[in-house]
């Protein structure tokens, strides 16, 4: 038995929550113990650009992008659990980081 930590990131929290629900369902079907999903702090990146290409430094526009994250710990992963995770079809905008931690 080994512990697996999944970290998921996405710009849209609705797509992220659907993917997390699919992962949790797949893991629970195999009988593995799961902890989470744990919501991670939302990271915000702000960009300020000039509206005018030449003058008017006071005229600026601000853009913001939010990165949402979730973390799932699979405590007692089996080979069936790993197979079911590999067969999942997640949305393309989800970034998944997988770490294996031996007990």
Curated annotation (Swiss-Prot):
PROSITE patterns cross-referenced by the UniProt entry: RIBOSOMAL_S10
Coiled coil: none
GO molecular function terms attached to this record: structural constituent of ribosome; tRNA binding
GO biological-process terms attached to the record: translation
Keywords (A to Z) from UniProt: Ribonucleoprotein, Ribosomal protein
A single cellular component GO annotation: ribosome
Protein name: Small ribosomal subunit protein uS10
């Amino acid at each position: 038995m080994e512990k697996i930590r999944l970290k998921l990131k996405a710009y849209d929290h609705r797509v992220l929550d659907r993917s997390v629900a699919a992962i949790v369902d797949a893991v629970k079907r195999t009988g593995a113990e799961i902890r989470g999903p744990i919501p991670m702090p939302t990271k915000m990146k702000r960009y300020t650009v000039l509206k005018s290409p030449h003058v008017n430094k006071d005229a600026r526009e601000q853009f913001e992008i939010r990165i949402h994250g979730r973390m799932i710990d699979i405590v007692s992963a089996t080979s069936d659990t790993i197979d079911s995770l590999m067969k999942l079809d997640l949305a393309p905008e989800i970034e998944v980081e997988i770490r294996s931690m031996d007990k």
